[in-house]
Curated annotation (Swiss-Prot):
Its main location: cytoplasm. Substrate binds at R27, Q28, A29, G30, R31, D77, Y154, S209, H327. One of its GO terms (biological process) is protoporphyrinogen IX biosynthetic process from glutamate. The gene is hemE. It is found in: Cytoplasm. Homodimer. Belongs to the uroporphyrinogen decarboxylase family. One of its GO terms (cellular component) is cytosol. This is Uroporphyrinogen decarboxylase. Its EC number is 4.1.1.37. GO terms for molecular function: uroporphyrinogen decarboxylase activity. The record marks D77 as: Transition state stabilizer.
Length: 354
């Protein structure tokens, strides 16, 4: 495979010296870009886009043609793993993802099989290897998965939820059943992420989108415990270099110290946390990624520039910061404003690395 020309992102995650703060955006390949909309229309629907390695590669590369980004992230969905377990994933307009066969009983959980990443999830691996080849070493490729807790919320609820009533009922009334499900999911995610590394992913990220819905103790029991299991089982060295791992719990500001103890390399921060405060709390244990409010991209380029400066100043001098949004970019953001954000990071960050 081609030698990596820009390793700023990987170096920052490992707290090695960099010349500037690396930057990428969660959901950088997405609906805010007209070229993405055109490719998605060509594919027919979202999952057809995910399952076509060439088109998934095309949308992964689109934001890199527009912007000076320091990393590419695999174009896929966190729900590929439960879909491969046979739950029948489909998308309803305005409703988001749904499952034909929710996993809301002990019997349903017992019947679940751990998917083979090279078989049922082979389309993801083909996308990873295609993207890695087409990147030609320009920037590193990030592979990812949802966390066991987050995947379980969709599987038990049958889709998106605002209240998480069904899964919380299972957590408190039938905890053994939920632990069985989370254990199977953790084993599945370990295989899935290690297969991504084997096919060319150079960094890994675990998205715990709904960990913040849990109480203090329940988070440790039902979310963090299983992310810890995954971190322990991951391939951490490939292609002659370390494969950094980032954990991101949206709404997880309460648990940064505990997350940093898992052995991961970096923590993603949402916009509710002050990044300077987070740095003081975790010390030298982990790097930090984040954490501008995605809605700030609706502001003027001047205001975006100011906000970038404020976050850089809050983090302070030295490596260990990957600039990102605090969650995914919104679909109605002006692409020019996303460009202003990225350019501001490149312009303002070098002074913090002298």
């Amino acid at each position: 495979m081609a030698e990596l020309k820009n390793d700023r992102y990987l170096r920052a995650l490992l707290k090695q010296p960099v010349d500037a703060t690396p930057v990428w955006m969660m959901r950088q390949a997405g609906r805010y870009l007209p070229e993405y909309k055109a490719t998605r229309a060509q594919a027919g629907d979202f999952m057809s886009l995910c399952r076509n390695a060439e088109l998934a590669c095309e949308v992964t590369l689109q934001p890199l043609r527009r912007y000076k980004l320091d990393a590419a992230i695999l174009f896929s969905d966190i729900l590929t793993v439960p879909d491969a377990m046979g739950l029948g994933l489909y998308f309803e307009e305005g409703e988001g993802p749904r499952f034909e066969r929710p996993t809301d009983t002990v019997d349903a959980i017992k019947k679940l099989c751990i998917p083979d990443p090279e078989d049922e999830l082979g389309y993801v691996m083909r996308a990873v290897s295609t993207i890695r080849r087409e990147l030609k070493g320009e920037v590193p490729l990030i592979g990812f998965s949802g966390s066991p807790w987050t995947l379980a919320t969709y599987m038990v609820e049958g889709g998106s939820s605002k209240t998480f009533e069904k899964i919380k009922k299972m957590a408190y009334a039938e905890p053994a059943a939920l632990h069985m499900l989370l254990d199977k999911l953790a084993d599945s995610v370990i295989l899935y992420l290690n297969a991504q590394v084997a096919n060319g992913a150079q960094s890994l990220m675990i998205f715990d989108s709904w960990g913040g819905a849990l109480s203090h103790h329940a988070y440790r029991e039902f979310s963090l415990r299983y992310m810890q299991k995954i971190v322990d089982g991951l391939t951490r060295f490939a292609d002659g270099r370390q494969v950094p791992v980032t954990l991101f719990t949206k709404g997880g500001g309460l648990w940064l110290e505990s997350m940093a103890e898992t052995g991961c390399d970096a923590l993603g921060l949402d916009w509710t946390v002050d990044i300077g405060d987070a740095r003081r709390r975790v010390g030298d244990k982990v790097a930090l990624q984040g954490n501008m409010d995605p809605s700030m991209l609706y502001a003027s380029p001047e205001r975006i520039h100011q906000e970038v400066g404020q976050i850089l100043s809050s983090y302070g001098k030295g490596t260990g910061h990957v600039f990102n949004l605090g969650h995914g970019i919104h679909q109605h953001v002006d692409p020019e404003h996303a460009g202003a954000f990225i350019n501001s990071v490149h312009e303002l960050s070098p002074q913090y690395h002298k």
